Each structure stands twice: as C-alpha cells, then as structure tokens.
Amino acid sequence: MKMINKLIVPVTASALLLGACGASATDSKENTLISSKAGDVTVADTMKKIGKDQIANASFTEMLNKILADKYKNKVNDKKIDEQIEKMQKQYGGKDKFEKALQQQGLTADKYKENLRTAAYHKELLSDKIKISDSEIKEDSKKASHILIKVKSKKSDKEGLDDKEAKQKAEEIQKEVSKDPSKFGEIAKKESMDTGSAKKDGELGYVLKGQTDKDFEKALFKLKDGEVSDVVKSSFGYHIIKADKPTDFNSEKQSLKEKLVDQKVQKNPKLLTDAYKDLLKEYDVDFKDRDIKSVVEDKILNPEKLKQGGAQGGQSGMSQ
C-alpha cells in the first residue's frame, strides 16, 4: 500500500506511555516510570523528550491496527501471506538470506509477517470504501509489449544510440514487425534494449493510465488488441508498442483493482483519511489525551498534510 507508510509506522514503546497518561501527565508517584536518589523519571518527562507527534503517531497506529484486525481478520487469508513470504525467500536466495536481509532492516520474520497482514487489512478497508468496476479497470489498463531502442542522454553513455541512429533503427524494426506481427516477441528478444522485458518477448504486463511516459501511454491506449504501433518517441527512446490481448484479465483483475485504488488515494488522500475517520466513529474511539487528539486530527487525519508529505512505501519494510 502506497500511502499507508506515512501513517503506519512501527509501534514503539512510547505508545505504552499513553496508558499511564490519563487526561494529562503529571509528576505524581503513579506517573513515575523510574525512581532514584537523584530524582524520578516521569511520564511527563519522557513524553517531552520523545515528542507528542511521535507518541500520537505510535498510539494512533496501535489503535488503528487493533480496529483493522477486529474488522477484517476473517477476510485476510494467512495462507496467501505465507505464499508472499515464500516468494520473497526465493527472490533472496533462500530463507536464511531473506531473514538476514530482514535483520538488516531491524525486522524479524514474525514482524514482517505481521506487517504484511496489516497491509492486507488496509487493502480490505480501501476496497470497502473505494468502489471500482470491471469496466473502469478495463478502461484504465492495457496489456502491452514493446521494443525499445534507447537514446543516449550524453555521448559518454555506454547504452543506447544517438537520437538519429536510434530513430532509424526503430523504424527498420517497425517495418520488420509489420511484415509479420506474430514474430514480435522473437524480434523483441533480439533487438529491444529494455533487457528486463526483452527476456519475456517484450512483455510489460498491464500498464495503467498515469503509470508511465505520457507519449508511450497515449500511443498504447489508442491501439486495439493485437495492433502494433508506429515508432513512438518517449523520454526513454524509441518504441514499437504492441497491445496484447488481455486473455488473463480475470486472474489479474484484483491486482489491477488494488493498484487503481492506490492511484486514487495518492491523487486524493482524503479518501484514506475519510476511511480512517469512519473507522474511529464505528468503533467509538475516544482520545483521553487532548494533545494526542490534536496531533491526530490536525496532522494524521488531515489530507492536506498527508499530501504535502508525499506517498510512501508499504508497511512490510521490504519490496515485493
């Protein structure tokens, strides 16, 4: 989830302080955390040191996670989460290497799994609040393949060609493809300078509107399924684009929907903050500390503040 990490940070011990705070922290004995002959350390001292913003964020996170777990625990499949973890382990070359990589980020395997579960709860929440139809998914996505001839940004670049040479080569390839479109994949594997997609016959999978270069997108979404474009120039170089038939649409539909939801939230963070506010109301959330309430309302649940902060990565702590 792209927008989630801005609000959902790892819960620290500071969240536990709130249980002792009550309406406001004082220097009374019952609010003393540590005592000594040199003096006591109180809840108020610690809150002042840590900062109310961090405490508010941590406490809000803890509360939100409890609510999400209560509401969506029956909708999140642990088997799918385990499959995600197994996939990551393979990418890292085995379980031991994966867990070592987690440790370098201050995570345990259990914490990583917990983060994946929380991210899944958020997906369920946003799916409840933001409705996207099949027709909208089809309108905003297109399955594509391409052949790319890169243009050097400077003469010293090792990859790519000069603009004139790149354009000429792309035009030659386009003519070759036009003669026999069924050989597109074979030609892409041989000629494309996008090595990642070239290995897969030029396949890019599903491209969403707003996800890539504007000129590439414009050309792609004009094509009918199975059609091949003329040479298209983008910020990456020159492309020959093919609109692939979406034969696997049904199996990819849920993933595409989640990506479109992410896009909507990034463009309009109010969708996320409104979803949180609805949860607080549904679960009768009552802030016992005025300062915490103020930070949550003015910063965490303020869509403008969230927008200024920008979209961040998901909660798992590692790329998937």
Swiss-Prot record:
Signal peptide as annotated in the record: 1-20
Primary localization class, coarse: membrane
PROSITE patterns: PPIC_PPIASE_2, PROKAR_LIPOPROTEIN
Enzyme Commission no: 5.2.1.8
Membrane topology (UniProt): Lipid-anchor
Lipidation (N-palmitoyl cysteine): C21
Domain PpiC, residue spans: 139-245
InterPro entries reported in the protein's UniProt record: Foldase_PrsA (IPR023059), PPIase_dom_sf (IPR046357), PPIase_PpiC (IPR000297), PrsA_foldase (IPR050245), Trigger_fact/SurA_dom_sf (IPR027304)
Protein name: Foldase protein PrsA
Taxonomic source organism: Staphylococcus aureus (strain bovine RF122 / ET3-1)
Lineage: Bacteria, Bacillati, Bacillota, Bacilli, Bacillales
